[in-house]
């Protein structure tokens, strides 16, 4: 066989195989996204404890072998679904911050509005972020606390960089921002447990009170 033909055949054999116009990597990515979506749906409607690999695969329309192609176990899926949805929430908040007026009240209101709107409009996301992520394992607990710390750092960074509020007189500012994030989450949990009885505007005002109180405390206690 001529060398040129051998070379062409070898190059062809090394190229990604395609099926119905998609490469193997593309199909794996599609299955991965299907499983993430199915995981959110099943966990959001049934709870993590009841979310079996079989039920997630049934929701995704895939066999179990494809589940283990992407995830080692249910907990690994939970972690990826959680990280995906925290990014989704953070992106919604950042977009709101970008559009808000550059003052402390408007900035806080915009972020809180985006946060509570997202939970209200996406009950599966709310159940995952507020309840189902808790108490699963030490590894998942660490993931949860890391995410909460990231939100606290985000708010502090944006607040300071835009000079929206000055709480420099408080000895441990990190504690304050972490506390604000935790308090807003608890408001959200209570709201969800009452089946979102209060209107979004009312819940936003409750959260805004906490941020205003932190700012006012510093203003009133600065020499």
Show where each model-derived region lies:
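Amphipathic alpha-helical packing segments from all-alpha helical-bundle domains
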Residues: 87, 91, 138-164, 174-186, ...
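Alpha-helical DNA-contacting segments of helix-turn-helix folds
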Residues: 26-30, 71, 76-85, 92, ...
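Helix-turn-helix
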Residues: 42-76, 80
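Short, amphipathic alpha-helix enriched in basic
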Residues: 22, 28-55
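Hydrophobic/aromatic-rich alpha-helical bundle segments in the mid-to-C-terminal region
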Residues: 130, 162-210, 218-223
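N-terminal intrinsically disordered/low-complexity leader segments
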Residues: 1-30, 166, 219-223
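Hydrophobic alpha-helical connector segments
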Residues: 80, 95-121
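Amphipathic alpha-helical segments used for helix-helix packing
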Residues: 121-139, 156-159, 189
